[in-house]
């Protein structure tokens, strides 16, 4: 709650507000992941002469990507649909981005009233959420969840002889969310389609903050992930930088 101020006096800032301001500053980080060999660091990369914010760049990278366009060929499951204009993953992603825009506007209204975010940083909330909404299904394989199960089944049979190799375990528990993080977080292999999102957009993207290494092969139950073993070091550094790690390290 903002304190009342007398005429001619500045508004007092409570310790709670200082903490929230610092937290938002971390959450709205414009930094991007930089991978060099085994080393993971961050850089404030901005295209020269680009008037857009780093978060608008995230949004644009998704819109103009081939992976995003391919979502038009991936349908959502609609058994016995009554109409012939059912959703595909592309139209669904556009709708999710629109919902994220709506939620972001409400968040902006609240933080603006509370004074939790510097005025010049408030727009970052909207763009990072829209970018995450637009890209949230970009890692989905063909046939969606059925495709995930097919990959898991193939890896379980094919990789059985390789034992506990972490990469094979990634395939055994394959999840489109983790594949999306892989595509959106990395900056290496320039000839590949890596988007190198800002940390703020990556934080908005993650729905299930669990790692593939925490699931044993063949374990029962739903296995929704944030990152594969190949991106575990990246995920941990991003999560720590955003201040999303609990006191117990989880």
What are these model-derived regions, one by one?
Residues 2-3, 14:
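Short terminal hydrophobic/aromatic SLiMs and anchors at protein ends
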Residues 17-51, 63-74, 83, 94, ...:
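Sequence-structural signature of the catalytic-core scaffold of metal-dependent phosphohydrolases
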Residues 82-88:
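Short glycine- and acidic-rich boundary segments immediately preceding or forming the N-terminal edge
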Residues 10-16:
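Short, positively charged and aromatic/hydrophobic N-terminal segments
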């Amino acid at each position: 709650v903002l304190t009342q101020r007398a005429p001619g006096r500045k508004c007092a800032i409570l310790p709670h507000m200082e903490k929230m301001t610092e937290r938002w500053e971390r959450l709205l980080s414009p930094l991007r992941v930089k991978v060099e060999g085994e080393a993971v660091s961050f850089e404030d990369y901005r295209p020269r002469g680009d008037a857009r914010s780093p978060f608008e760049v995230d949004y644009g990278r998704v819109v103009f990507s081939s992976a995003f366009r391919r979502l038009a060929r991936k349908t959502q499951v609609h058994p016995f649909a009554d109409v012939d204009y059912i959703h595909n993953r592309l139209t669904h992603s556009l709708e999710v981005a629109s919902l994220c825009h709506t939620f972001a506007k409400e968040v902006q209204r609240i933080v603006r009233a509370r004074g939790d975010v510097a005025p010049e940083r408030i727009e970052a909330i909207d763009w990072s959420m829209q970018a995450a909404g637009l890209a949230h299904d970009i890692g989905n394989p063909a046939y969606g969840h059925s495709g995930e199960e097919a990959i898991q089944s193939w890896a379980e049979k094919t990789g059985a002889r390789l034992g506990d190799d972490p990469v094979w375990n990634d395939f055994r528990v394959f999840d489109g969310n983790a594949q999306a993080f892989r595509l959106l977080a990395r900056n290496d292999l320039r000839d590949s389609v890596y988007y190198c999102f800002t940390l703020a957009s990556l934080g908005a993207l993650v729905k299930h903050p669990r790692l593939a290494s925490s699931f044993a092969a063949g374990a029962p139950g739903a296995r929704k992930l944030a990152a594969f073993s190949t991106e575990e070091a990246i995920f941990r550094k991003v999560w720590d930088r955003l201040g999303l790690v609990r006191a117990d390290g989880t």
